[in-house]
């Protein structure tokens, strides 16, 4: 039986609603933070990364791209800019996005917005890590 519930909401949709969780690991701006039962109430900024939550002894992954996490009374609420469950990620599409971003960054002659290209590459890498197509321990 799970001790906590996890809800993940984006501006477009609710990704998870009251999903049972025994543990949650969120990517915050200064690293990763683990959340267990009876965690102190808090709010933290999220960074682009892989959120992991333990359900029935198995960790599940969600790609998140910034936002906030709130913990209160064994309820974890994530308000993310974007979020995608690992099983919903189109790996081929994410690989293509990674390839395009890398090509843009390699092209020294192109007049590109490096910040946007680097952000696109980070998003693609996180999606691939969440889907298990890349080493997800490097998040």
Curated annotation (Swiss-Prot):
Pfam family of the protein (one): ATP-synt_DE
Membrane topology summary: Peripheral membrane protein
Domain of life: Bacteria
Compartments where located: Cell membrane
InterPro entries: ATP_F1_dsu/esu_C_sf, ATP_synth_F1_dsu/esu, ATP_synth_F1_dsu/esu_N, ATP_synth_F1_esu_C, ATPsynth_dsu/esu_N
Main location: membrane
Entry function: Produces ATP from ADP in the presence of a proton gradient across the membrane.
Family from the record: Belongs to the ATPase epsilon chain family.
Name used for this protein in its record: ATP synthase epsilon chain
């Amino acid at each position: 039986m799970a001790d906590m519930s996890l809800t993940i909401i984006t501006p477009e949709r609710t990704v998870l609603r009251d999903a049972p969780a025994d543990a949650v690991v969120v990517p915050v701006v200064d690293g990763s933070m683990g959340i267990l039962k009876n965690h102190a109430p808090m709010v933290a900024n999220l960074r682009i990364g892989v959120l992991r939550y333990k359900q029935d002894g198995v960790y599940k992954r969600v790609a998140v791209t910034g936002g906030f996490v709130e913990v209160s009374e064994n309820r974890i609420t994530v308000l993310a800019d974007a979020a995608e469950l690992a099983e919903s990620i189109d790996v081929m599409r994410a690989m293509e996005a990674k390839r395009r971003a890398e090509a843009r960054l390699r092209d020294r002659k192109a007049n590109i917005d490096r910040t946007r290209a680097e952000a696109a590459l980070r998003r693609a890498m996180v999606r691939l890590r969440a889907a298990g197509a890349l080493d997800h321990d490097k998040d």
